[in-house]
Amino acid sequence: GKSIIETVRLIMETGTCPKYEEIKKKKDPRKEFIEIYGVGPSKAKELMDMGIKSVQELKSFDEEKIESVLNEKQRIGLQYYDDILARIPHSEIKRHERYLKSVLKKIDPNSELTIAGSYRRKNKTSGDIDILIKANKKQIFQDFVQKLKDDGYMYEELALGDKKFMGLANMAKGKEVAKPTPCRRVDIMITTEKEYPFAILYF
């Protein structure tokens, strides 16, 4: 009809369509909720069914209401939502790498640490920091994670197993700093020398 012809003419003249641009700007609440760490499709639907329209609206709730809606890990995900979504510059990960290697060397000089993923592939930015430790004792992994916590480098624990740790780290190393840098998603995995070549490909 006439409106379609007008829309086509507008696109040809300006290269864009205001209505389309407006639609693009509107965020899909479900997609936005799923970006919160620990929130899956069913939880996202539950939040939408409650009438919550955005992450920003969810953040505006008081502490008691947030606790009634989200579990502990999801609350951490909401608190650090912007930090977790932010890309990490290659140069910043280099700083993490220097610190992490110095910590591991003090615990066990024979163990090795590699930052894998997009950092190892020389990408300009990364979504998180994937740390692979090559060591012959699980205790080294446990001591390493504990030292990161003691230093104040590891802000939040998201998951901890025998061979893998997931958390949020900050190069400011301590919550007492006036302006801490963004918290970064960090995954740490321990592997034996035999498993290492396969682990580096996976991680």
PLM regions: where:
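Accessory alpha-helical DNA-binding modules that contact the DNA backbone or grooves
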Residues: 2-129, 133-167
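A short acidic, often aromatic-flanked loop/helix-cap motif at beta-alpha or helix-coil junctions
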Residues: 61, 195-197
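Conserved catalytic core of two-metal-ion nucleotidyltransferases
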Residues: 150-195
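Short, solvent-exposed helix-loop connector elements
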Residues: 198-203
